[in-house]
Structure formats: C-alpha cells, structure tokens
Amino acid sequence: MRPEPGGCCCRRPMRANGCVKNGEVRNGYLRSSTATVAAAGQIHHVTENGGLYKRPFNEAFEETPMLVAVLTYVGYGVLTLFGYLRDFLRHWRIEKCHHATEREEQKDFVSLYQDFENFYTRNLYMRIRDNWNRPICSVPGAKVDIMERKSHDYNWSFKYTGNIIKGVINMGSYNYLGFARNTGSCQEAAAEVLKEYGAGVCSTRQEIGNLDKHEELEKLVARFLGVEAAMTYGMGFATNSMNIPALVGKGCLILSDELNHASLVLGARLSGATIRIFKHNNMQSLEKLLKDAIVYGQPRTRRPWKKILILVEGIYSMEGSIVRLPEVIALKKKYKAYLYLDEAHSIGALGPSGRGVVDYFGLDPEDVDVMMGTFTKSFGASGGYIGGKKELIDYLRTHSHSAVYATSMSPPVMEQIITSMKCIMGQDGTSLGKECIQQLAENTRYFRRRLKEMGFIIYGNEDSPVVPLMLYMPAKIGAFGREMLKRNIGVVVVGFPATPIIESRARFCLSAAHTKEILDTALKEIDEVGDLLQLKYSRHRLVPLLDRPFDETTYEETED
C-alpha cells in the first residue's frame, strides 16, 4: 500500500463491511483512543489515530493460563528434584555419565560459577543443549544448510556426522530485508572493494585506518537517518557498551527499560551512573521515575542530577514489542531529559521508508538525542552506528573507547552497507528496496495472523517482524526445536534465564526473502508440531471472516 500524498502510510481504504485493511477497525470493533484493554486474561495495548500517535498501535500480551503456569513450575520442580538426585548418584559414582563431575586435580580450585548457575547448566541446560549453536554451512538466507551432529555423552560434546541437512527454512536469522545473500549488486560491489582495499585495515580510525569509505558511509548514514552527523563502529554490541560510558558518568541518572538488551545494560553499568529501571513500555512507570529524579535529586546530597538519560529500544528482540516512542519523546521534552534510542532491530525493518521506529511513527529525528543502530540485521553486514548532532559525534570521536581503540570497519563490509542502504533509499535506480520493505510488512502481518488463527499465544506488536510463540514448559523447549528441525524448519528457542522462568518461547524472525510458499510450509509444520506438543494455549483464537488473500484479511475474535 503506497501512502497518499499528504497522508499517513498506515491508513487503509475502507471496506464495504466497515473494516479497514490491516488497520484501524480490528476484530469487529473500533479501537478506543489511547486505551489498554484487558479481557479474560488478554492484554491489548491499543492506540487510535489522534493525539501523539499518527497511526494505530496494537500490541498483545496474552496472560499465561493459570493451569499452564502451575504445570510449568511443576516441570521445573521435577527437573530440579531429579537434578539433585543425579548429583547424589554422581557423588557415589552410580551415575553412568561422569562428565558433570569435577576433576580430581581441580577439587581445590576456586569455583567459576555460582552454585545455582552451575546446577542449572549441568542438569537442565545440558538436556536441551543440542538446540543451540547449530553450525550452518551456507548463506543465512531464506533457506540454510545445517551440518548434522550427534552427541554420545548426553550433549556434553558433539561430533559431526559428515551429513548436510539441506534446504532448511530459516526462521531464526535477523535477515529482515533479505540482503544476506551471495549474489546481486551488494555482493558484487563488496567483491570489487575487497580487490581494491583488502579485507582489513589493521589500524584504528585515529591512526592510519580512516579510509575514504568510512567517510562516505558516515555521510550516507547521516543522510539516511535525517541527522546532522553519524559515526560508525565495527561491532554492534560495542556501539552500546562502549559509548554509553562516554555520555554519562558519576552524578548522572540512567532510566532503562526492564527488557533492554545486554549491551545497553553493560554500557549503563560501566558508566558509573545511577541506574533506575522502569516497567517495560510503561509510560506511567517512566514518568514516576522522572518526577522522583527531579524532586529528590541525587541520594544523600539531594543535588540535581547532571544528566538524565532514557534508554529504550525500537523493537525489543525477545518480546516483539515496539517502543511507545511518541510518549517517550513527550516525557523527555516535559522533564528535560535526554533520549538514547537503540534501533538495532527496527532500522530497515520498520517505517514506510525503512528508517526505523522514528519513521514508523512519523516523528522528527531531531527529537531523539542519540540514535543508535546496527548493520548486522537489515543490512546483512556487521557493525553499528550512532547519529545525532554534530557536536555529539565530534565528542564521541575523541571520548568513545570504541572509536579510539577499536580497529576500523572492514572495507568490503562497509561497501555491503553502502550498497544496501542506497538500495533502501532508492538511490540505486531501482525500486527493490521499497519492495523489500513492503514485502517484509506483508509477511509479518500474514505470519502473525495465521499463528493466532491456529490458537498459539503470540507476543508483540502486529507490525513487528520478531514473533515470539509461547512454549512455557521446559520440556517443550527442546521438543519444539527438535521437531521443527526434523521437518526442515530452523527455529530459535529461548528459555530461562534469557526469559522469565515461566515464559519460555520460540522466536521467529520474518524476512522479505520469505515467499508465501515458504511461510505456508513453515506454518503447516508449526501447526502440526503445535498439535503434537499441545502448544495452542490461546483463548482468543482469530477466525477469518472472508477468504484471505495474502496481504489483507478481516477477523473476528472468539474466546474458547
């Protein structure tokens, strides 16, 4: 759907039955303005056009059914009980597997792990360890080839069989726009730059590692974001963890969303600033912390904080939720705080022009003080960037550890980013970038709706390409991953401690490279595995009212 001149890209034409395509009227009723609807255990965060928002904002987090929560705790209890029993049997050398016992020569060594972490790794994680770190031997595109491996010691070690599992549908990579491939203009350009510049720079930007390609990339990133200047880094994680300490320090206050990425958490801790946590995407919680910070100031001295920095993400990679950016910006302006926005997952994946969550909401980039993002996902490359005022970027060039001490970004990687970014911007003379953005949006809505029709509990925003499917029980984490691989579907499964103990999940990442046939194949297998493992917990199954084309459907919501 192309936006009308002077209109909002999210507005859809009205149907004869009163419903709006992919938009304002959903499930047979009109969304109320800026409301939270909680009906029979389902939590909807919905926002109608008007006020701060220029487009509908719909997120769903269905509450865990009570019986499922109880059975999940019972499952962990049984696993813990048998874990202690196995430790007892190992102590008396009755247990056959001795890999979990400590070596005699290391008995007197200082423990490397906390007791519970050690216990959890030995007795719970090892049971399902085969679901992670699976080696692939192909481009991480819509399909991948996986090297088959077997374990003969209960997942403590693996041996390759020599077989290759070919054509596995890839539902786990962050290849949002499909640029992770080995053919096409991006790869040809990167190959030419590799011939001219080589693979590495072997120096920092401060010394002799500042190439003309670095300058070209940073100017392009600034133009793409709509900011005065930008700086690029060779590692996305370090872009957060090494730059936040340069922005804030002792006497400053960081207000961080409780579900922020580990790189943001590490950067906040390294900074030495005081850290306060607000509830995920909860503006009342954030505003209370802002009020308290201004009223009470620093602990003991009651002096005003030197800076107040709000840390949020565009798309939260475990929840599939989108930051309520218009409200965050309104609070930031009201209380004179600074805003640090991590667009690692949202840049390229959201917005009519692929410019991230700022573009998605139709906001002014100047309202965000620090715009951070990575090239590892939508651009099919590596590294990260920070954009903002020229004064900010000049300051970071001399004070950021990642800028001063890190080796410069590889030339062919930079060329991959430059070419893919120009494609997204339409500067390559084609409409490929725009088509990829539109295809990703259609794939996202289609995949989410089909899963909800099947009866799964799905978290997150309806426009988020990150789609968490709730598994809950620990035994179903490993079972789901293995059953999907048997059916040639590669998925990511996640459990405690990466998620709350009763909120284990599978996480699907949609891509513009996925065709309807690929998605339908994956959905068919997910449906079968869902029945096999009894994963269809939702009491709010969506039922299609009309025959469904690929990109537009109306639904009614039924309660089982």
Curated annotation (Swiss-Prot):
It catalyses: L-serine + hexadecanoyl-CoA + H(+) = 3-oxosphinganine + CO2 + CoA; octadecanoyl-CoA + L-serine + H(+) = 3-oxoeicosasphinganine + CO2 + CoA. Pathway: Lipid metabolism; sphingolipid metabolism. The keyword Transmembrane applies. It is a single-pass membrane protein. It comes from the Eukaryota. InterPro entries: Aminotrans_II_pyridoxalP_BS, Aminotransferase_I/II_large, AON_synthase_class-II, PyrdxlP-dep_Trfase, PyrdxlP-dep_Trfase_major, PyrdxlP-dep_Trfase_small. Component of the serine palmitoyltransferase (SPT) complex, which is composed of SPTLC1, SPTLC2 or SPTLC3 and SPTSSA or SPTSSB. The heterodimer consisting of SPTLC1 and SPTLC2/SPTLC3 forms the catalytic core of the enzyme, while SPTSSA or SPTSSB subunits determine substrate specificity. SPT also interacts with ORMDL proteins, especially ORMDL3, which negatively regulate SPT activity in the presence of ceramides. Forms dimers of heterodimers with SPTLC1. The chain crosses the membrane at residues 65-85. Belongs to the class-II pyridoxal-phosphate-dependent aminotransferase family. The keyword Thylakoid does not apply. SUPFAM superfamilies: PLP-dependent transferases (SSF53383). Component of the serine palmitoyltransferase multisubunit enzyme (SPT) that catalyzes the initial and rate-limiting step in sphingolipid biosynthesis by condensing L-serine and activated acyl-CoA (most commonly palmitoyl-CoA) to form long-chain bases. The SPT complex is composed of SPTLC1, SPTLC2 or SPTLC3 and SPTSSA or SPTSSB. Within this complex, the heterodimer consisting of SPTLC1 and SPTLC2/SPTLC3 forms the catalytic core. The composition of the serine palmitoyltransferase (SPT) complex determines the substrate preference. Disruption phenotype: Adipocyte-specific knockout mice have reduced adipose tissue mass and develop hepatosteatosis with insulin resistance and hyperglycemia. It comes from Mus musculus. This is Serine palmitoyltransferase 2. It is an enzyme of class 2 (transferase). One of its GO terms (molecular function) is pyridoxal phosphate binding. Induction: Expression levels increase upon high-fat diet (at protein level).
